[in-house]
């Protein structure tokens, strides 16, 4: 395989929803889980597959936690490329990586420390021969309701999936998709959204329950049990 596999972890946010009122303002990705920062777990999960040649962590300028959080991890670098939103952070990290157009980029949430090695391998295996690339996802199992304080309707869950990460695309395709989305003023919440907006159909690859995104305060206790 001539193309390299490079992982990008956007870690420039603060994760305010994960904090309880009055808690110290330690960014979510640096809060401890099973004795280690959550970000370290997420990066180690990516390093479990030797086909990933490097993990690049994008942090905010002046980040005072990352060096200690990731000390000693192989094939890992961190760079102050954090932007005002996820898409800008990923685009900056991609530009900083020096990746060739045909290299594969795997973007993974810092708040998904429970990524199983089998799910990561499944994604890579499925995407290496795919013309577009893809993402880990889970079919929606629960009944879905739309509404604010009251239900306005029940949404047909047939064909609905919950997007996870990593999301894996060629560097050239992803770079172009993110640039197009920005030029069009599209608010994309993940890389697949940008790729879809560029006219492509990413592949859906079975994810894992334990690969959920740590978002709310109670999620830390649940993830501790997985780790």
Swiss-Prot record:
Residues annotated as site: Positions MEP for the nucleophilic attack: 157, 213
GO molecular function ontology, one term from the record: 2-C-methyl-D-erythritol 4-phosphate cytidylyltransferase activity
Catalytic activity: 2-C-methyl-D-erythritol 4-phosphate + CTP + H(+) = 4-CDP-2-C-methyl-D-erythritol + diphosphate
Keyword Transferase belongs to the record: yes
Site (Transition state stabilizer): 17, 28
Family: Belongs to the IspD/TarI cytidylyltransferase family. IspD subfamily.
HAMAP family assigned: IspD (MF_00108)
Name by which UniProt lists this protein: 2-C-methyl-D-erythritol 4-phosphate cytidylyltransferase
């Amino acid at each position: 395989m001539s193309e390299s596999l490079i992982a990008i972890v956007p870690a420039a946010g603060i994760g305010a929803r994960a904090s309880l009122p009055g808690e110290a303002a330690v960014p979510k990705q640096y809060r401890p889980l099973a004795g280690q920062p959550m970000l370290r777990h997420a990066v180690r999960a990516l390093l479990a597959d030797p086909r990933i040649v490097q993990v690049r962590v994008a942090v905010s300028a002046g980040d005072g936690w990352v060096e200690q959080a990731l000390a000693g991890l192989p094939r890992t670098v961190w760079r102050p490329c954090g932007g005002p939103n996820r898409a800008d952070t990923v685009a900056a990290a991609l530009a900083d990586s020096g990746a060739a157009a045909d290299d594969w980029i795997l973007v993974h949430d810092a708040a998904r420390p429970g990524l199983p090695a089998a799910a990561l391998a499944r994604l890579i295996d499925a995407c290496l021969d795919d013309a577009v690339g893809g993402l880990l996802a889970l079919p929606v199992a629960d009944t879905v309701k739309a509404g604010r304080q009251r239900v306005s309707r029940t949404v047909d869950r047939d064909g609905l999936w919950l997007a996870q990460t990593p999301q894996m695309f060629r560097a050239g395709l992803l770079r172009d998709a993110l640039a197009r989305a920005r030029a069009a003023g599209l608010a994309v919440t993940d890389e697949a959204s940008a790729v879809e907006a560029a006219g492509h159909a990413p592949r859906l690859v079975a994810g894992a329950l334990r690969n959920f995104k740590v978002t709310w305060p109670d999620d830390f206790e649940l993830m501790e049990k997985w780790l």
